[in-house]
Design a protein with these regions (language model features):
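Short, flexible loop/turn motifs enriched in small residues
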Residues: 52-54, 65-66
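Short beta-strand scaffold segments in enzyme catalytic cores
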Residues: 55-61, 137-143, 149-151
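Short glycine- and Lys/Arg-enriched binding-loop motifs that mark or flank ligand-binding interfaces
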Residues: 57, 73, 84-86
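Hydrophobic beta-strand positions in blades of beta-propellers and related beta-sheet-rich domains
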Residues: 68-72, 140, 148
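Conserved short S/T/G-enriched processing/targeting/catalytic segments and their helical context
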Residues: 1-53, 80, 85-119, 128, ...
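Acidic-glycine-rich active-site phosphate/pyrophosphate-binding loop
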Residues: 59-76
Length: 175
């Protein structure tokens, strides 16, 4: 991730320098859609050089026409876009929950900010219960046209381990 951080910082500096010294009134080309395409080419090249970056990256933001953009790129340079995305353990457990609320682009567009944050909080609770090594604290980032709002000290609410008392051994449980 440090390589990507340095590389993207250099890219942003180059972009700002070129934009500052050009006479074109054109807006910056470094938006979410272009960044995603750039990352997919970078990851694909590294894969072909037999030196892959072992990351799954989600890119969120806005494209050139100011439409919301959400896509992923993996270590092979494979790209994917969807109304909701997750990586790692969340791709297996949280993604079905998010699809319940945002199965299509239209469903996702109808979600309010509060509803979307509540869906993410529900997903984080499920992930916390299913991973013994997880913490009950997490961060949430909300991307809007005005910028990124980062809330770093979120904590799971209404935790209840009452269901654990009924679990005996492994396998199918009968009551």
């Amino acid at each position: 991730m440090q390589f990507l951080d340095r590389h993207l910082t250099e890219l942003a500096i180059d972009e700002a320098y070129e934009h500052e010294h050009s006479e074109s009134p054109q807006k910056s080309q470094l938006n979410a859609a272009n960044l995603h395409k750039y990352l997919s080419k970078l990851m694909y090249r590294r894969r072909n050089d037999f030196d892959p970056l072992w990351n799954q990256i989600l890119v969120a933001g806005f494209d050139t026409s100011s439409k919301p953009f959400l896509a992923s790129v993996d270590l092979r340079g494979t790209t994917f876009t969807s109304p909701s995305l997750a990586t790692g353990f969340g791709a297996m457990l949280a993604q079905p929950i998010m699809r319940r609320y945002a199965a299509t682009e239209e469903d996702a567009a109808r979600l309010t900010r509060e509803e979307a944050v509540n869906v993410v909080k529900e997903c984080m609770k499920v992930l916390f219960y299913r991973d013994a090594r997880s913490l009950d604290r997490y961060s949430i980032a909300v991307v809007t046209k005005d910028g990124v709002e980062l809330s770093e000290d979120e904590q799971l609410e209404k935790q209840s381990w009452a269901f654990a008392e009924r679990i005996r051994g492994y396998g199918t449980q009968t009551v």
